[in-house]
């Protein structure tokens, strides 16, 4: 049985306004279970554009995308929304926590949306994720009362709540100082090593990328 979690086959993408420009060109690669992969390249090379395609948030592309060996349709948004909630965890540069809720509730929200477990089970799972990340003591604090580095760890716990097949990150350390960036890297590394969590992280930080299992480097919309 294959352990390929994510596969892109000949992905091409064009922007058409005001003129037709190719922004992704013949992108093909795969990521196996437990791999910690970084996606790097200069600003404007297509990293974030590719991540949006790989995450199923952008379906306007040519080629094929497979998640857990299943080809992703381009026209079925309700199916793709379920895939995003169930099989993909997202961590962005900005944490996007909801200040009106405490830390625990923020982590629970994607689990409640999935509607696979009871609220009590989702709460238990959320506390487990917070414990793994060493921030269970923050569970009842309001989201706007924790530090920037802590907020990003809360966002990682939230990304883990549904036990996703892959975590995708778009510059998750871009807003953090070196200490907190290293902390986030160590968390990702531990998730990969101990829990066989698959990760694909867009980063412009060379010191972050060089410590991952593999670097996919982009230039002018191509993998080089």
Whereabouts are the PLM-identified features?
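Conserved ABC ATPase signature
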Residues: 142-150
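A short, proline-enriched helix->beta-strand linker immediately N-terminal to the Walker B motif
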Residues: 161-165
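Short coil-to-helix segment of the ABC ATPase nucleotide-binding domain corresponding to the Q-loop/switch region
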Residues: 101-110
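Helix-to-loop junction immediately C-terminal to a conserved catalytic motif
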Residues: 55
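The feature captures the beta-strand-to-loop junction immediately N-terminal to the Walker
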Residues: 40-42
């Amino acid at each position: 049985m294959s352990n390929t979690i994510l596969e892109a086959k000949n992905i091409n993408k064009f922007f058409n306004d005001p003129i037709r420009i190719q922004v992704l060109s013949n992108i093909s690669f795969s990521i196996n279970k437990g791999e910690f992969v970084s996606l790097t390249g200069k600003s404007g090379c297509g990293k974030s554009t590719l991540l949006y395609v790989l995450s199923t948030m952008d379906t306007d592309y040519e080629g094929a995308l497979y998640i857990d060996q299943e080809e992703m349709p381009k026209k079925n948004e309700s199916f793709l929304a379920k895939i995003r909630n169930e099989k993909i965890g997202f961590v962005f540069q900005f944490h996007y926590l909801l200040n009106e809720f405490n830390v625990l509730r923020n982590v629970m929200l994607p689990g409640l949306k999935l509607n696979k477990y009871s609220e009590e089970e989702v709460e238990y799972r959320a506390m487990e994720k917070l414990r793994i990340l060493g921030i269970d003591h923050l569970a009842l604090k309001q989201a706007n009362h924790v530090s920037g580095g802590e907020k990003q760890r809360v966002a990682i716990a939230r990304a883990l709540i549904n036990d996703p097949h892959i975590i995708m990150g778009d510059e998750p350390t871009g807003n953090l100082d070196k200490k907190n960036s290293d902390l986030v890297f160590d968390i990702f590394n531990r998730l990969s090593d101990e829990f066989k969590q698959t990760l694909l992280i867009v980063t412009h930080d060379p010191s972050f990328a060089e410590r991952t299992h593999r670097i996919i480097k982009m230039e002018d919309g191509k993998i080089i």
